[in-house]
Amino acid sequence: MFSRNFTTPSIRIYLNSCVSHRSFHNTTVSQSWLSRIRDRFRGTKEDEKKQIADKDMAAMKVVIPPKKRVSKWKDIQLFEKFAEPSLNREDSLKMINEIRKSLQLQTPWSPEARLQAVKLAYQKTGRIVYDAPLQNIHNWDDLYNYYDKIVDYGDTTLHGRLAWKPTPGLMSLPNVVLHVDENGYPLERKKRRLSRSVA
């Protein structure tokens, strides 16, 4: 009896004074701990939001620049423009000879001298020297031969269109319809002149 009365109060005291470790794993206790942690971090986030809201929000806004609708190459001159039109073969060769007399360069040309001569020829004639044949140009004769034999002049220039005249054999062909006269001038101009003279 004595031992029973002695042990039971001590057990009761021990149970009341110390919390069992099993109670920590209960769902209610774990939820309370999680809610405390959540409330703690939620409070700090709400405080940060309040602090930001009190500040000047316009200064903290992220400004996204508008999308560029204009090309970056607009109003930028990539190649030089010429006031005069591109020259034909005869005038280009004359210009090369004039440049040759005015610009004295040591032969064989260095890369700098070659670039200087080619750039000046391009400025004066309006005919560019492309990269592939540029490596084979070492003196004025090579540059002259390039403008004489390699450059495709065609008859796109005003001088070329007016200087071209059809041959009599071409005009006599039955299947060829020419819109120019024997001097190379358009036939429409003749019709206009005739209509004006008749009127």
Curated annotation (Swiss-Prot):
Mitochondrion in keyword set: yes
Chief location category: mitochondrion
Subcellular compartments: Mitochondrion
Keyword Mitochondrion set for record: yes
Keywords attached to this entry: Mitochondrion
GO cellular component terms, semicolon-separated: mitochondrial large ribosomal subunit; mitochondrion
GO terms, biological process: mitochondrial translation
Name of the protein: Uncharacterized protein C24B10.04
Organism, as annotated: Schizosaccharomyces pombe (strain 972 / ATCC 24843)
